[in-house]
Amino acid sequence: LLSFVASLAVVDSIGSSGKTIAQIGCATTAIAMMESYRTGTTIYPDAMSKKLSYSSSGNVYWPSNYKAVTNSSGYLTKIYEKLKEGKPVMFGAKKSSGAQHWVVITGYNGGSTLTASGFTINDPGSSKRTNLQHLLNEYPTIYKYFYY
């Protein structure tokens, strides 16, 4: 299992959006977790936000060293393969309203049949959502996922 240090800063703003990391910074915080693991150092969301670029509404422009997958076909198997390589996976899902949320998938502790509930997550917005199924219960549409 991979572990990270994560916190949502309340006052640090996202680009020129006027919104704070606590309000719209789940993607920034998830990238900070991913980069903390990749570099072996602790990178906090406020420091990460200064390294990233954002649209005027606060949407992040993804780091170029990350590969995006937008096809949800076979996503559990693909994510499992990345975890077996020792790489966490950043995962985004949406509500029917279009609202998005981002988490980091850190491991798999389910059985031999892959299920969303078997994937452990670090959720920058909730300590109660601890597996991928918890996220999909609230954000049922898979948006995309990233890995490095």
Where are these regions (language model features)?
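Structural recognition of the beta-strand scaffold that forms the well-ordered cores
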Residues: G25-T28, P88-A93, V104, F119-N122
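Active-site-adjacent structural segments surrounding the nucleophilic cysteine of cysteine proteases
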Residues: L1-L52
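Active-site signature of cysteine proteases
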Residues: E35, T39, S96-Y148
